[in-house]
Amino acid sequence: MYKNIIKLISGDITKIPEVEAIVNAANSSLEMGGGVCGAIFKAAGSELAQECKEIGGCNTGEAVITKGYNLPNKYIIHTVGPRYSTGENREAERLASAYYESLKLANEKGIRRIAFPSISTGIYRFPVDEGAKIALTTAIKFLDKNPSSFDLILWVLDEKTYIVYKEKYKKLLEI
């Protein structure tokens, strides 16, 4: 079941028209940042920054939704992943929450096709190997509880991160 819904690709998340929503690895102030966040803000245009300013912010492990503006997607779901320090400050739990809350919000809005970046594994320094496992197991758990909720849960990754996710996904499907 999962193989038909959870997919991984290497590419640019701002250029995925086949999904209704993309997820932004946001900062808590919902301002334009670097990496994926910066690319999403640039591609969406200045109206996104205005809507985010009106929302006011988002706590770590939570999610909010905006319009997609100039992106080929109807919505952007903004979620804040944890900054990684020692791994002993509930980072794994908070990262799982960021993914879960994004899926929950998308499901509540009737979104059937969603694309994620790898949350917190860039400038927030979450180990990619552990982050991939958390991302994929959280999606699997969500689908187990809500089997008909999504047609596609896509991870759009850079080449290096894609290789790690692909290996983790392969191992998870063997269990």
Swiss-Prot record:
Native organism: Fusobacterium nucleatum subsp. nucleatum (strain ATCC 25586 / DSM 15643 / BCRC 10681 / CIP 101130 / JCM 8532 / KCTC 2640 / LMG 13131 / VPI 4355)
Family matches, as Gene3D superfamilies: Leucine Aminopeptidase, subunit E, domain 1 (3.40.220.10)
SUPFAM superfamilies named in the record: Macro domain-like (SSF52949)
Family note: Belongs to the MacroD-type family.
Descriptive protein name: Uncharacterized protein FN1951
Annotated ranges, domain Macro: 1-173
Alphabetized CDD domains for the sequence: Macro_OAADPr_deacetylase (cd02908)
Tree of life domain: Bacteria
